């Protein structure tokens, strides 16, 4: 498993705690709840993602609502919301990462923590977001 994947997994678990339980983000980002070894690179990447989502949550949630087609945000599972949030953040803030890689990573996380059906939903939403919000702004 790559350090980016582990960092994303950590970020997902952290965002889940923040969203579901209301854990303070700074407390969650200490990762003292995680019982496996974490490299500095994994932790730094997870913190980057979590901070980015926390700081941009309102705007990201607006985008999720826009592209979720007739789904209220509250109807989307906490795990799926968190995956969408961190993936949209990556698509917006990490232009050096190829969009298909970010979307594939989101799909893999969804398969790991949710269902195949959820993975299709995540893939479709992120693909639509990318094609309408990111791709037109990329230099050609």
Swiss-Prot record:
One GO term of the biological process aspect: transcription antitermination
UniProt keyword Mitochondrion present: no
A single GO molecular function term of this UniProt record: RNA binding
Claim: Transcription is one of the keywords in the record: yes
Domain of life: Bacteria
GO CC field: cytosol
InterPro entries: NusB-like_sf, NusB_fam, NusB_RsmB_TIM44
UniProtKB keywords: RNA-binding, Transcription, Transcription antitermination, Transcription regulation
Family: Belongs to the NusB family.
Role: Involved in transcription antitermination. Required for transcription of ribosomal RNA (rRNA) genes. Binds specifically to the boxA antiterminator sequence of the ribosomal RNA (rrn) operons.
HAMAP family: NusB (MF_00073)
Protein name from the UniProt record: Transcription antitermination protein NusB
